[in-house]
């Protein structure tokens, strides 16, 4: 057991899907995995291990933001020897051609978080996806008839920004979408020499102001889940 994850040795698979919402983790386990067993309920952050097409896979909620995700990723890697981490979550579109429910695969993640500034003594680090997982996800999406958008995203620490137009600068430089975790995930994956990828579904658009409901975000954004499960090793 680790501090925040109550699993015993060998209860977590080498590939873990990482939704921010623990209820989404529960939904995925109940609707996609066979023989799913709950290994964690600490702080209500559900974790399950089961099988998808014969492959052993875990799904672990992380909570919102880089600090919360970093706790779970550190413990999954260092206490449970996890090798493949696939974040599945929602994002806000920053581009007019990226619509609600589109799939975004994060090739890299810019960030306004200070966490890497502190880690790298004020210098800039470029958090980047595992090419192995990225290529597999892109190829699988195309095979499934899903056209993903692939590129740089923004990981932000601020959900409610005092400047409602701050996103426009990032959009000008081609950033596809905004969320709150990926830069932390990719940095830790690089630090510990494991593979990580983020696959996102667009839940709202900063360009048009459109948005989906909370219930829809929890239960119907399943193309990203299918892609993630299909590339699990």
UniProtKB/Swiss-Prot annotation:
Positions binding phosphate in this chain are 20, 24, 43, 87-90
Provide the site residues for: Important for catalytic activity: 217
The residues the record assigns to binding a purine D-ribonucleoside are 4, 179-181, 203-204
Q: Which InterPro entries match?
A: DeoD-type (IPR004402), Nucleoside_phosphorylase_CS (IPR018016), Nucleoside_phosphorylase_d (IPR000845), Nucleoside_phosphorylase_sf (IPR035994)
The record's section on Pfam families has: PNP_UDP_1 (PF01048)
Q: Is RNA-binding set as a keyword in this record? A: no
Which domain of life does this protein belong to? Answer: Bacteria
Q: What is this protein called?
A: Purine nucleoside phosphorylase DeoD-type
This protein's UniProt keywords = Glycosyltransferase, Transferase
Q: Which family does it belong to?
A: Belongs to the PNP/UDP phosphorylase family.
Its EC number is 2.4.2.1
Q: Quote the catalytic residue positions.
A: 204 (proton donor)
- What is this protein's gene name? deoD
